[in-house]
Amino acid sequence: MGATATQVLTDEETLVRALLEVNRLYKPDGQPVVFDLQLEAEVLGCGLVWADDCPPSVSSHPLADTMTVPCRCTLPTAESGRMPMVLSAMRRMKEAVGDTTALYGLLCGPFTLASHLRGNDIFMDMFDDEDYVKDLLGFCADCAKRMSDLYLDAGMDVIAVVDPLVSQISSDHFEEFLSAPYTELFRYLREEKQAFSSFFVCGNATRNIEVMCRTAPDSISVDENVDILAAKAICDKYNVAIGGNIPLTSIMLHGTQQDNMKFVADLLAHLPEYKNFIVAPGCDMPYAVPVENTIGAAQAVLETEAVREKRWNVPFALDRKSVV
């Protein structure tokens, strides 16, 4: 398309155009509308640094010098920050592809949002002032509920709570600080909103897979640092679906189309069963992933047996004229 990441994340027409092309080319069963964990942080006063080839990053933390909890009156609304653009794009996507594609509304998980607001001191706070951390996480969990309400009203089918920093803490700390807010959040989505939920985590979250399952999400998504077969065995005990975990850099970005097809075909071949399993990239895909590679990965899901039998030196053809 020739658009930068900043254009995609700030201009509705560019975003919708990109989403529709992704849907046409890759034919996904499920598709996020926006993968930007700084939406809430921006609304709540964090400064952002923008880039052409990735989502923005947080550059300042409003609670860095004060151990306070923001007023609930500051929680995002449909008019806050970039929310009007995002919600409009969600409604347009729901109308365009909602009959064939499950649409994911991605929000920033409580722990990562707390770190956006407080900065790295949040980790020391977990030892020095547990009550403050729990209060701040309570605010961030309320923010997640508010975002969920907005996304569900805009037609989203699945609420994905994305919390990369979960991989940075122990299972004991997870149970002390995160089990309660996450259990309540997923209960809220399941019982009060009748919505599906997903728990996205990045990094090596192996030690936390079981405690994540105990918070009762409908699904979990992990990246390449997790042994997905071992993680699936844990998830199966709790009847939680698991998604992942095509390597983002070595396979999707720097590999060939054949590498992507073979990785997915091999992954599926090692599963004891397909039930409760979602083939997906390990996390948000790098900006420069070749279109052919993602088409190859999708083809291996849609036509698994044909891909297994195919000679690996014959790539699937891509009509470049069809890529806008």
Question: Where are the language model's segments positioned?
Answer:
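A gly/proline- and charged-residue-enriched helix-loop-helix capping module
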Residues: D53-R92
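Short, flexible, mixed-charge acidic loops at enzyme active sites
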Residues: G47-C54, S59-L63, S115-F123
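Active-site loop segments of alpha/beta catalytic cores
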Residues: D29, P76-V324
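Short, solvent-exposed turn/loop segments enriched in Gly/Ser/Thr/Pro and often Arg
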Residues: F35-L39, V201-G203
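Glycine-rich loop at the start of a catalytic domain that most often binds anionic cofactors/ligands
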Residues: G2, Q38-D53
